[in-house]
């Protein structure tokens, strides 16, 4: 594992590309719950979850953990972040970006997923016969059979995929690319080209969820465990300018929630991550749209955790969690930079954590991991590169305290929420 890249990403306030599960301290119950959810989704279930956490509590980090688990279990995953360019009231744009962001453990893009599947069918046909015409026929039959359930849901989606294979065999690569572009939601395809691969119309706000349902069925039918869609910074919905636009966005969330419960989606997991304001704000948050709020709100007034609720809270770290994560970071740093930190850092580890907990005292001892992680790695980097300078442990503690003060004064503009 590339510890140096992981440490660099964390120091910069970003979520590492890999290895995050190793650092998912204090979230064991949540991780176990999502392991179970992914197993249920593999068995035809469709589920929607909302993650509620303060900025810096680790929502994006936890989404990355879910992503890694999903890849390990052979899911196709898409991660989108809501923004001005991807507002949830424009569900057709959301669909396009979900498809654009598709990944599996072997590669990226819907094109890769389709081509890899067809290549596998061609290899099977090649093993059965050496006759090229019979091979093509076997592949066409296998494609037709694999798309049976998708075809029942939306014939156009299946038709575009079947036509793509046929057009590739005919070496009409231009139209074949149009067929894949149409599946991705491209609305700039000439009518004459769409007619060649047997479809009409485009992905619109009226049918985008229907296309998303077809996509979930398709990826399962060709051998994947299902579809996982991770939607970060869902609180952006509150920034939509009018109540009408926000209501449209919340209604699409409700549609996805209902369609999962009604069985219209299969083998699908949708995870929305947001700050508490989305769930609490009466004027602009989910409570402002009763139809969604009624489905999500907790009827029990209790602080006891319940992982099976639609919304689960991602709490800040406690001192024990910080001790555990700092211990892991210390080991990673020693391995990455080939030095012995035990003499200078281990004796004051409890003091370092204590400083951070004291600084976060206003939160009742619950702390967000991001500031601590960034400060701690900065100190490790500084001490490792200047070992002869640090004669006194108090000097190290002062560096940590100063770094924390700097980070707390920053206006955080990172896209990733550790």
What label would you give each PLM region?
Residues 16-22, 52, 80, 196-200, ...:
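Glycine- and acidic
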Residues 1-47, 389-418:
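A short, basic N-terminal segment
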Residues 61, 124-126, 237, 399-408:
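Eukaryote-specific, cytoplasm-facing alpha-helical/coiled-coil scaffolding segments in long proteins
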Residues 35-38, 67, 95, 99, ...:
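Short, well-ordered alpha-helical packing segments
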Residues 94-102, 253, 326-330, 376:
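Short amphipathic C-terminal alpha-helix that caps PH/PH-like domains
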């Amino acid at each position: 594992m590339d510890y140096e890249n992981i440490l660099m990403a964390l120091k910069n306030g970003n979520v590492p590309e890999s290895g995050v599960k190793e650092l998912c301290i204090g979230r064991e119950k949540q991780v176990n719950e999502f392991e179970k959810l992914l197993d249920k989704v593999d068995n035809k279930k469709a589920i929607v979850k909302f993650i509620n956490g303060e900025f810096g509590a680790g929502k994006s980090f936890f989404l990355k953990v879910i992503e890694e688990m999903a890849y390990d279990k052979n899911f196709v995953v898409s991660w989108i972040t809501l923004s001005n360019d991807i507002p949830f009231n424009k569900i057709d744009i959301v669909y396009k970006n979900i498809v654009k962001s598709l990944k599996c453990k072997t590669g990226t893009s819907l094109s890769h997923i389709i081509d890899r599947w067809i290549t596998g069918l061609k290899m099977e046909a090649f093993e059965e016969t050496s006759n090229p015409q019979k091979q093509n026929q076997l592949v066409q039959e296998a494609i037709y059979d694999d798309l049976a359930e998708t075809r029942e849901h939306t014939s156009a989606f299946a038709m575009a995929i079947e036509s793509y294979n046929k057009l590739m065999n005919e070496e009409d690569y231009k139209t074949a690319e149009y067929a894949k572009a149409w599946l991705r939601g491209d609305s700039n395809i000439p009518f004459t080209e769409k007619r060649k691969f047997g479809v009409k119309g485009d992905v619109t706000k009226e049918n985008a969820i229907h296309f998303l349902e077809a996509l979930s069925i398709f990826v399962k039918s060709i051998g994947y465990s299902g579809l996982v869609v991770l939607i970060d910074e869902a609180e952006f919905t509150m920034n939509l300018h009018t109540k009408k636009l926000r209501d449209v966005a919340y209604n699409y969330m409700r549609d996805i929630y209902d369609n999962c419960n009604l069985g219209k989606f299969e083998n699908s997991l949708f995870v929305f991550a947001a700050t508490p304001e989305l769930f609490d704000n009466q004027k602009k948050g989910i409570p402002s749209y009763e139809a969604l709020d009624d489905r999500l709100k907790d009827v029990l007034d209790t602080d006891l955790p319940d992982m099976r609720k639609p919304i689960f809270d991602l709490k800040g770290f406690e001192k024990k969690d910080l001790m555990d994560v700092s211990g892991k970071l210390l080991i990673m740093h020693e391995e990455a930079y080939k030095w012995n930190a035990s003499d200078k850092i281990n004796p004051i580890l409890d003091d370092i954590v204590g400083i951070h907990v004291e600084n976060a005292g206003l939160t009742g001892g619950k702390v967000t991991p991001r500031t601590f992680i960034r400060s701690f790695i900065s100190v490790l980097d500084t001490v490792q590169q200047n070992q002869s300078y640090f004669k006194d442990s108090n000097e190290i503690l002062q560096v940590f305290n100063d770094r924390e003060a700097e980070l707390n004064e920053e206006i955080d503009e990172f896209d990733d929420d550790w």
